[in-house]
From Swiss-Prot:
SUPFAM superfamilies per record: Cytochrome c (SSF46626)
Cleavable signal peptide: none
Pfam families: Cytochrome_CBB3
Subcellular location: Plastid, Chloroplast thylakoid lumen
Name of the protein this chain belongs to: Cytochrome c6
Its biological purpose: Functions as an electron carrier between membrane-bound cytochrome b6-f and photosystem I in oxygenic photosynthesis.
Annotated PROSITE patterns: CYTC
Entry annotated with the keyword Chloroplast: yes
Length: 85
């Protein structure tokens, strides 16, 4: 797991909608610790699945990012949520 790579992947692919752990499209579904817990997204498996397959307005990144990049970005999101972004 490479958190620095995860940060780079996040900045390039996720930050347009999720800058600072927020959510521009659905403001109640942020990447903050409490929201991740409430939505049962506070684990690598759930985040990896959603990044890979997309959901609602969120596009699937499975065809655009490698499995390694997706795993790294999931670890970055969990790490940042625990730090409070």
């Amino acid at each position: 797991v490479d958190i620095n790579n995860g940060e780079s992947v996040f900045t390039a692919n996720c930050s347009a909608c999720h800058a600072g752990g927020n959510n521009v499209i659905m403001p109640e579904k942020t990447l903050k610790k409490d929201a991740l817990e409430e939505n049962e997204m506070n684990n690598i498996k759930s985040i990896t699945y959603q990044v890979t397959n997309g959901k609602n307005a969120m596009p699937a990144f499975g065809g655009r990012l490698s499995e390694t990049d997706i795993e790294d970005v999931a670890n970055f999101v969990i790490s940042q949520s625990q730090k409070g972004w």
